[in-house]
Structure formats: C-alpha cells, structure tokens
C-alpha cells in the first residue's frame, strides 16, 4: 500500500471525512505512512479527534507554528510549511493523493522533494464499502426522506381544485410551499435539505429542474429528495411521482413500466453484478415498449424523450459517487449503497421516475427505502 496524503476539511472533502469522521471546518492533513495513520492539525481540534478516533496526532505547535506566525507571513504559506514539516515528521517522501488535492500545495511539496501521484480510483475504492457509522447515517437520512414525503403527501391529499390549479387552505399549493413543509420535517430529523426537486407538469421532463410554481390537477409531480445526515455527512436519495386527480393513460403506462423496471433491476443487485448490465436490462424493457433510450438512439442524437439518463449511482458522503449504473458500469461489491431510478419522459408534457436506495450485501441486497409507489398521494 502506498503512502497517502489528503488535505482539506471534513465538510467539503468526502475522502477526508471517510478517514476522519469528525466535523472539522478548517484545512488539515491526513497521512498514512509506514503503517502510521496520523493527522497534522491545530490544537483546537485535538480533543475531538482524540475522543472520536484512534489516529496519531501531530499538533501544529509541535512543528513550529508559533514561530511561523511570528514571522508575519501569509496564512496560506504557514499552512504549506506545516504540511511539509508534517510529511517530514512522518517520513513521507512519495504518496498518492486524491484528485481534490490542492494544486498549489502539490506544487509546493514537489518543489521540496516529495513525489505526489493523483490516484482517483484508489480513493474512490476506499469509501465504496460503507462502514457502520456511515450506514447508520444513510438510514437516518432515508427515514427523514420518508417523513418529509409523508408531510408533502398530506398537503397533496388536502388540495382543492381551483380552476386547473390546486389550493390548500385558500392559498395556492406550489412547489415552493411543498419544499418548505419538507424542509421543516428535515430540520426535525437533523438533516440538511439541500436543493431538493419538487417539480410538476412539463418541468418533470427536464433533468434536475428543481421545480417552481403552482401545482395543477391531473399532472405528474416528482419529488426527488436527497437530504444529508448532519452527524455523519452521509446522504440518502429517493424519488416518487404523484398525480392529484386523474392520471392520463400515458402516465399510467409509464408508471407500470417504470415500476417493472425498478423491480426487475433491483432483483438482480448482488455482489459482482455489473452496473452496465442492470442498465441494459432496464433499457430492454423500455425499448420493447417502443421508447427511446441511450442505447437505441441515433449516434449524436440529443435525447429528450424516453429514458435519457442512467439507472443509478452510488450514495454516501456524496449524493452522486461510485459505482455507476449506466452506459459506464462498475461491478458491485458488498457495502455499496446505490440508487435504482428508472424513468420515462416526454418533453413539453412531463415525466415519471421512481427511485429506491439499495445496499449491496454479501448475500445479495437490502432495499433501504421503505415507501409505497402508488401514483395517488
């Protein structure tokens, strides 16, 4: 195993948060060198790191930070020098770093004789299999998803038709209002809401349209929720689609096909299953029903109808991470947490998507999501 270096903070660096499960807002160095696992860190953070991890701690003060501050040089230069001194203290002369490693810091270390090699795959693999704490955080975030959607569905059920729009308690029922209700529930569950999707009508056919405006009768409403557990920094991800009123025959067909695709692809999830093969299974279902996918379109065609996105992705310290289930697919391993999210769309009209969160286990899989799929809210 090569020596490793990661520099950043545990709020923005998933690679670092996986190794140091403590919320630290300022940049610091994590190193694996010669069998040692250590952090080079400010004294302010030492008590929590000592309490919550078994990492070796090298304090900035041990490396001469007081003398560096007395020189009056810029803080970024002090940080670079402390990282260099930390590397020398730990015996690092050559190391692998993630793609997020700061370019300026990398140049500085190389200029001082430390060889660095970016190894994206190495760091992605290290956090593929979720540890016990990360899984607990994902499950908490998923429970928050379900509670938030419960609250939103209650508003949909109470909605009254006013023309072709929907009102609740005499006020228009909008995407923004539904989001606020969900955000309140998320706050109660100690998760961060992020930029959730509550889209409706033609918006639902536009990839990652966050949604806005008044909800209308008989149109699809897509809820794609991906809150982050504050304790661990881990995400969940779930999508459901509803219609207040009477869904069209087209939407009913989409729902039947998408649910079939979800069930059949999820059934194949196990260690060694390939993400591309699962994607092809779903594309076959949709293509057999006459829909376009990325596999049967014309070369160079920009697809706006049918099934135009991947089947899923990994979820953990990032809401989108490895493995991939799409035209590029990875073999699944025990401990992967993935989404399975087939959908069908027609530009200018709408779309329908269902998404579950699935844990790959030694014996096969576990569907973490525990929520109904009906179109009626």
What are these model-derived regions, one by one?
Residues 1-377:
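Active-site neighborhoods and metal-handling regions in enzymes and metal-associated proteins
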